[in-house]
């Protein structure tokens, strides 16, 4: 795991967790828009830190490492945690850590990917396909449709794929995603948590229902016209929305019935 610090050490603290196959560089266009006001911590998970010496295992293991870092370096407190896709698993476990205080948390694109009896088949097929994506830097058409993304947006993501990603790490991320919502989440009635997603991405309705069992005051925000992770391709918008959420928590909700 690699954690990079940017910005104003006197500002409020913000931690960014990346999506699958990504690393901290997924936020390289966002960080310059935040670092004048905030102290920004950008994370690369085990298996995605470019060293070839670490392996992603579980979301809980990543959360434990982050908790240790926050406890040591930030006196156990973080003002805002932003997690994209894969990062949502570690974020949920980190929010439940008894030694860590997180003021506000945003889960962006925390899709419900549990397909029941099909999970085992998916684990036999999908990690190999995504492993090829990591090394060939190419996203097939079916993957674009699945994510609700366009080719231009995906090209931006592909440039952020780090070196030395192993098949073992990719498989572990798929297992983490498929089984995340079987976790017995800690109920946190007063937690200031938001779920953000793009209008074009699916698998969100069940995710929102499940997240509300842990965070009854969950704020849901749907971004019109966006696919999975696409908000990161709009760094100015993302920066302004992060600052707004950190300031007032936000009140906007998605339209009734959205979140397929």
Predicted regions and their residues:
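Conserved HGGG/HGGXW glycine-rich cap/lid loop of the alpha/beta-hydrolase fold
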Residues: 4-52
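Active-site loop/oxyanion-hole signature of alpha/beta-hydrolase fold enzymes
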Residues: 41-80, 240
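Gly/Ala-rich beta-loop-alpha elbow adjacent to hydrolase catalytic centers
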Residues: 82-87, 91
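Flexible "cap/lid" loop of the alpha/beta hydrolase fold
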Residues: 96, 100-133
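Short beta-strand/loop motif that positions the catalytic acidic residue
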Residues: 189, 195-197
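Acidic catalytic loop of the alpha/beta-hydrolase fold
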Residues: 199-204, 229
């Amino acid at each position: 795991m690699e954690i990079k610090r940017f910005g104003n050490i006197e500002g409020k603290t913000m931690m960014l967790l990346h999506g699958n196959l990504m690393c901290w560089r997924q936020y390289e266009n966002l960080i310059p828009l935040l670092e004048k006001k905030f102290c920004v911590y950008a994370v690369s998970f085990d298996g995605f830190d470019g060293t070839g010496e670490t392996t992603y295992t579980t979301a809980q293991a990543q959360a434990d490492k982050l908790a240790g870092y926050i406890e040591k370096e930030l006196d156990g407190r973080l003002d805002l945690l932003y997690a994209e896709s894969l990062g949502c698993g570690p974020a949920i476990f980190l929010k439940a850590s008894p030694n860590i205080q997180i003021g506000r948390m945003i889960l962006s694109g925390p899709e419900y990917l549990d397909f029941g009896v099909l999970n085992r088949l998916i684990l036999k097929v999908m990690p190999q396909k995504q492993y090829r994506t990591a090394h060939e830097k190419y996203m097939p058409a079916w993957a674009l449709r699945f994510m609700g993304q366009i080719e231009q947006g995906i090209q931006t993501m592909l440039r952020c794929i780090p070196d030395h990603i192993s098949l073992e790490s990719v498989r572990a991320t798929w297992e983490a995603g498929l089984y995340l919502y079987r976790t017995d989440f800690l109920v946190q009635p007063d937690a200031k948590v938001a779920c953000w997603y793009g209008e074009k991405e699916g698998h969100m309705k069940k995710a929102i229902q499940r997240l509300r069992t842990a965070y009854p005051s969950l704020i849901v925000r749907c971004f019109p016209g966006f696919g999975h992770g696409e908000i990161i391709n709009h760094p100015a918008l993302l920066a302004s929305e992060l600052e707004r959420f950190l300031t007032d928590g936000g009140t906007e909700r998605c339209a009734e019935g959205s979140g397929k």
